[in-house]
Amino acid sequence: MISVKGLWKVFGSDAEKVIGSPLADLTRPELRAQTGNTIAVRDVSFDVAPGEVFVVMGLSGSGKSTLVRCMTRLIEPTAGSLTFEGEDILQVNTARLRELRKTRFSMVFQHFGLLPHRNVIDNIAYSLEINGVKKAERHARANEVIELVGCRDFQTPIPNSFQVACSSA
């Protein structure tokens, strides 16, 4: 179970002073003009049950990426609580956080990057490689994914060619 309760991310100095004060009720431009701060995530709460598919949707600039980055602690929330399978994610140490990111958390970045010195198969199989999966298995699994998304003809070109060719697939 993932549980997010009262999660806030305020960018700027003295961000904590915004939460629970009349400043939190200001519009974005008003808050920015008065304090220099920006509220990116405002008092978000939800639970995701095991096996449940949960989608974060919203307009551009509404805080979706910031919310997910807070959930994975790529950026630190300003306030709130975040638990995963009963564990307080905001209290885990760096080693535990790294392990959770490696084995339990994932996100697809809005502007992802390919490793230009690797071919398409090796880019796709990279996460398997850093998790210690042998090369033959990595490539077999990467080929399954390539077949699944209909990009079999783009397995070996340089990544930029793959990105352009498969973006319309």
Predicted regions and their residues:
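Conserved ABC ATPase "signature" region
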Residues: 20-30, 85-88, 129-132, 136-154
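ABC ATPase NBD coupling module
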Residues: 31-38, 90-106, 130, 135-139
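The feature captures the beta-strand-to-loop junction immediately N-terminal to the Walker
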Residues: 57-59
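Helix-to-loop junction immediately C-terminal to a conserved catalytic motif
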Residues: 72
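Short coil-to-helix segment of the ABC ATPase nucleotide-binding domain corresponding to the Q-loop/switch region
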Residues: 117-125, 158
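Conserved ABC ATPase signature
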Residues: 158-166
